[in-house]
UniProtKB/Swiss-Prot annotation:
InterPro entries cross-referenced by the UniProt entry: Endonuclease-V
Catalytic activity: Endonucleolytic cleavage at apurinic or apyrimidinic sites to products with a 5'-phosphate
A molecular function (GO) term: deoxyribonuclease V activity
Site (Interaction with target DNA): 70
PANTHER family: ENDONUCLEASE V
Superkingdom assignment: Archaea
Organism: Sulfolobus acidocaldarius (strain ATCC 33909 / DSM 639 / JCM 8929 / NBRC 15157 / NCIMB 11770)
Main location, first listed in the record: cytoplasm
Function statement: DNA repair enzyme involved in the repair of deaminated bases. Selectively cleaves double-stranded DNA at the second phosphodiester bond 3' to a deoxyinosine leaving behind the intact lesion on the nicked DNA.
Protein name from the UniProt record: Endonuclease V
An annotated GO BP: DNA repair
Residues annotated to bind Mg(2+): 37, 98
Gene from which the chain derives: nfi
Amino acid sequence: MEDFMIEFLSKLQIFISKNITIKRLGIENIKNLCGVDIAYKGNIGYAVSVMFDGKDYFHKYVKGKVDFPYIPGYLFMREAPLMIKAVESFQCDLILVDGHGMAHPRKSGIASVIGVILDKPTIGVAKSKLYGDIVEEGSTNFIVVNGDKVGVKVGKYYYSIGNKVDIDDVVELSRNGYPKVLALADKLSKELKKKE
């Protein structure tokens, strides 16, 4: 990847980070909870979104060719277009994204990018650490970036603010274990990949 392209993408992420809204959503107010994940077979991506309306689970999927290479910190270029296509037609009160939100070098991981583009509340849920310090306060392990609490580490998962939520929302969501909508999106995306 050319240096000028990386520089441009970094500027784009900084612009997105300046447009993130941090405000209390209230997990208890969510009626439609969505999760989105993606699996790959070669350069074909299989993005699956799952919505839970409090009673039933619904899902949609999109597949497409992905040409952008995997570059840590720039995952959004590879995954966001298909993820957005998979989730945008659901009426989501909160979208959980497999990936980071503000726990990112430019406070603009894929969950934040998707949240700002769709103008929706998002939380990133990742299986590995990308960026930030883990600071223990009582029984809570906060993820801190540039002095700001942007997420929490619970077990092996990293939850972080994407858009239109605050740290209390992230803490509250993280107490309920790994979200079923994400587990289902992960499972279905892998099943789709195997069928092809």
